[in-house]
Structure formats: structure tokens, C-alpha cells
């Protein structure tokens, strides 16, 4: 897997841990081993501009996902598709506030947002209650497995 992480946020980021988490999630979701992922950490003005440009929402957000080849999780009895999974844009400053509010800190929030973003890249959504249950359940399961290893 090719995982590129760019930190343009001005916030310290454990790039190796983030890459390992991404690889873990992609492996668990049976993403093709040659799939590509780019994660960019940016500041609040940058993510606010992207949020407005692409989501038509004002202000900063925590994570944006830009799927490329519309890859989906692999099935047990099928070979996964090769391609570019997509790009994630994270905002560590927003993550820091959310992590503090949630009581689990910045690093745990960045991990959560990374898993959340990868699931979006794989086609998961949470607009409807059933989708929400499925996506957040899977997100919790992946994070628990990551932290238990």
C-alpha cells in the first residue's frame, strides 16, 4: 500500500502511527495491497476553504474525504480492486477541540477521524440512521481492534 501523509497544519502529527493505522484499517477492510491513500493535515483556514468549495458548508470541519477510484471493501471470496483509494484532509486543530470535548485527547481524535475518513473513501456514509449505525459500529470496531493489538 502506498500511504502518503503530508503535515501542513503546523500541529505536531505522529506520521508513522497514522500510516500504520491507515494500513491496519485498509488491511482489515480488504483493500487491495497496492491501493494508494494520501492524508493531508491542514490548518483551519485551509479546511474551511475546502469545506466551502467542495461541501458548500461554511467554516472549518474535522475531516474531508475525496474518493478517487470508488474502491469498496474487498469480500472474503474475491480479490479486491486495485486503484487509488483517495485523499483525506484532516484538521488537527479541530480534532484537538473535539478530542478535548470527548475526553480522549487529540491523538485519539485524529485516529478516529482517520478511520472515519477511510470508511467514507470506501463508500460508507451516515446520512440515514441505518447507515449511521453501520458506519459508526464499524468505526468503533476498527478502532478497538487497532488499540488492542
From Swiss-Prot:
The keyword Cell cycle does not apply. One of its GO terms (cellular component) is cytoplasm. It comes from the Bacteria. The keyword Methyltransferase does not apply. Binds 1 zinc ion. Its EC number is 3.1.-.-. Its cofactor is Zn(2+). Keywords: Cytoplasm, Endonuclease, Hydrolase, Metal-binding, Nuclease, Ribosome biogenesis, rRNA processing, Zinc. It is found in: Cytoplasm. InterPro entries: MetalPrtase_cat_dom_sf_prd, YbeY, YbeY_CS. GO terms for molecular function: metalloendopeptidase activity; RNA endonuclease activity; zinc ion binding. GO terms for biological process: rRNA processing. Zn(2+) binds at residues 116, 120, 126. Its main location: cytoplasm. Single strand-specific metallo-endoribonuclease involved in late-stage 70S ribosome quality control and in maturation of the 3' terminus of the 16S rRNA. Belongs to the endoribonuclease YbeY family. NCBIfam families: rRNA maturation RNase YbeY. This is Endoribonuclease YbeY. It comes from Nocardioides sp. (strain ATCC BAA-499 / JS614).
